[in-house]
Amino acid sequence: MANNKKRGGIVVFVVILLIAAGIGAYTIATDSSRYDGSAGFFNNFIVRKDYIASLYIEGVIETENKTYNHEWLIDTIRSLEDDEKNKAILLTVDSPGGGVYESDEVYLALRDYTEHTGRPIYAYMTTLAASGGYYISCAAETIYANRNTLTGSIGVIASQSVDMTELLKKLGVKVETITAGKNKNMLNINSPLTDEQRAIMQSIADEAYEQFTAIVAKSRGMKIGEVKKLADGRIYTASQAKKNGLVDEIGTWEDALSSLRKELDDDESVVTTYRYEKKDSLLEMLSEAVSKAGKTDALIPDAIRSELMLGISYPAYIYRK
């Protein structure tokens, strides 16, 4: 009898694992598919009428998070480019920015869309379209901002390091990292930055800054010197941004759509929404629940935890509150 109960418990455990694996596989499949918040999956096969793509770019621009998936976004832009039923893209941007690489790749994909199809791109900024969010918006021929939008933040964070050598020493913790190359360990929490290493990271920031300002100058029809006067990393209100030539109009999403329709001379095309939203697998939900229940971070002081979470180890066009 005991053996039967044991075997029964094993069977139940295996079934739970199989269900979790199945849900995980389903989640992966849906995450990598084109997701339309109003019409379901594989939207390009469903829509038969001419349409304007309402494409949302939300959250931190990186490989993947709850609201942003880089691979999905690039694939979606390229699919729209290949679809003759698509007549234009209306971007809705609500992002503090993100990685230099990801921001530039999205910008280039949008520019390719316009150059290869001749179709227009408009951008509408909501709460925040800063740094990389503004960088991507520069791919649009016309930029609308909500009257409460914060934008700009034209600048670069090359990296952020936290020097914890003194703290580790007080705690009696000794960290050893074996490397080859004198600068291989830079940005490590147990290795203070040298002047040479600061210069290395500054050169990376400067190069990314030159790229950013050149993109803005080209997009906005401004001289590079004019852009650099504005590009000190600060954010701008919508009215300030318009006054300085960083956006074209202040209005609503409907205003932007109306203007785009007027340019297209088209009141009949439907508007189809493309918006990424990650769905956690059962395993991810269980892992999060276990983590919260275990309170594994309880021993880390809040000030230190916040610094570690905000750490940036790659060049980023991002607005920091």
PLM region spans:
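Short, conserved acidic/polar surface loops in the N-terminal third of protein domains
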Residues: 102-103, 133-136, 156
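Short gly/pro/ser/thr-enriched loop/turn and capping motifs at secondary-structure boundaries
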Residues: 130-131, 150-157
